[in-house]
């Protein structure tokens, strides 16, 4: 049986006494596209931060290629991070650098390659995402879709085995989002990358995913194929798929807040 390229075990995280992730277990297999779904506040971003080693959990482990990233040497962690390409929400391009300078940065900082080789790799990466003519432009001169593509070029500069996207379709119109989805599938097919996508955009999720995992209030409630996920009868999943708002109960807290609002507006009950 294939070993997972990323293995998360009993991951528990709290902030300010509030439990954000509650004993999450997840295996991501080599070469698959795993989409992590969940409403705002479900723990998606927290899980991503721990997956790439930007924070340490209260308990539990995150292993990449068999190495526990919270219990390894600095040298091992650096090697692991070189195998991780991350395209953050909002692209996170350096505004003071041209597009090609953004792509060159990890190559110059993390390799001993010559300038001429770096130039060739930079051009190849930009051409790969359809930005061969945009290298001299500044990030502020790019459209939203072009910024996302430039972020992908930078994330793949070191030829990582794992590519992680944080809300890749955020802020994009449907046509540009579909083009980005096609690029993600192209990366998987041609470069045989393992892709992890954190999103709440269902159209893109079902377009690219091999499997989907769903977080609900800090707990992982489903890890399923697209087909199984779309036909799930779990009410929490159905609510998310059908875009139905949560029903507000008539609790004492809600009633008290309503009375406060009425008083503030000077309206008698």
Regions found by a protein language model. Give the residues of each.
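Catalytic Walker B motif of ABC-type/P-loop ATPase nucleotide-binding domains
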Residues: 163-166
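Conserved ABC ATPase signature
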Residues: 138-142, 146
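A short, proline-enriched helix->beta-strand linker immediately N-terminal to the Walker B motif
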Residues: 157-161
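Helix-to-loop junction immediately C-terminal to a conserved catalytic motif
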Residues: 52
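Conserved ABC ATPase "signature" region
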Residues: 67-68, 115-133
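ABC ATPase NBD coupling module
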Residues: 69-85, 115, 229-233
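Short coil-to-helix segment of the ABC ATPase nucleotide-binding domain corresponding to the Q-loop/switch region
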Residues: 97-105
């Amino acid at each position: 049986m294939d070993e997972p390229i990323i293995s998360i075990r009993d991951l528990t995280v709290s902030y300010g006494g509030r439990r954000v992730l509650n004993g999450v277990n997840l295996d991501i297999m080599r070469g698959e596209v795993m989409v992590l779904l969940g409403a705002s506040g479900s723990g998606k971003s927290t899980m991503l931060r721990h997956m790439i080693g930007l924070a340490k959990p209260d308990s539990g482990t995150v292993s990449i290629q068999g190495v526990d990233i919270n219990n390894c040497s600095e040298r091992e962690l650096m090697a692991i991070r070189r195998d991780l390409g991350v395209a953050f929400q909002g692209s996170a391009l350096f505004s003071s650098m041209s597009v090609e300078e953004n792509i060159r940065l990890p190559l110059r900082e993390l390799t001993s390659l010559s300038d001429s080789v770096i130039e060739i790799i930079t051009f190849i990466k930009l051409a790969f995402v359809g930005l061969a003519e945009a290298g001299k432009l500044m990030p502020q001169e790019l459209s939203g879709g072009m910024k996302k593509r430039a972020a992908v070029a930078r994330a793949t500069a070191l030829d990582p085995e794992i590519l992680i996207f944080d809300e890749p379709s955020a802020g994009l119109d449907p046509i540009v989002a579909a083009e980005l989805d096609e690029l993600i599938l192209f990366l998987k097919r041609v470069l045989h990358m393992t892709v992890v996508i954190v999103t709440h955009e269902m159209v893109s999720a079902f377009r690219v995913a091999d499997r989907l995992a769903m977080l609900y209030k800090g707990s992982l409630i489903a890890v399923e194929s697209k087909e199984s996920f779309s036909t799930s009868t779990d009410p929490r999943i159905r609510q998310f798929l059908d875009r139905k708002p949560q029903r507000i109960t008539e609790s004492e807290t809600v009633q008290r807040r309503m009375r406060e609002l009425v008083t503030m507006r000077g309206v008698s009950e």
